UniProtKB/Swiss-Prot annotation:
Function: This protein promotes the GTP-dependent binding of aminoacyl-tRNA to the A-site of ribosomes during protein biosynthesis.
Keywords for this protein: Cytoplasm, Elongation factor, GTP-binding, Nucleotide-binding, Protein biosynthesis
Phylogenetic placement of the source organism: Bacteria, Bacillati, Actinomycetota, Actinomycetes, Kitasatosporales
One GO location term (cellular component): cytoplasm
Keyword Lipid metabolism included in the entry's annotation: no
Location of this chain's protein in the cell: Cytoplasm
Assembly with partners or alone: Monomer.
Encoding gene per record: tuf
Family recorded in the similarity comment: Belongs to the GTP-binding elongation factor family. EF-Tu/EF-1A subfamily.
One GO MF term attached to the UniProt entry: GTP binding
Name of the molecule in the record: Elongation factor Tu
């Protein structure tokens, strides 16, 4: 697996095996 870079307010989709297994929008980054 490769890390997914995300920014606040960025919509993202987590794909695995060509299918979307997770999707959403980053509301707050907890560092």
């Amino acid at each position: 697996d490769q890390p997914v870079a995300m920014e606040e307010g960025l919509k993202f989709a987590i794909r695995e095996g060509g299918r979307t297994v997770g999707a959403g929008q980053v509301v707050k980054i907890v560092k």
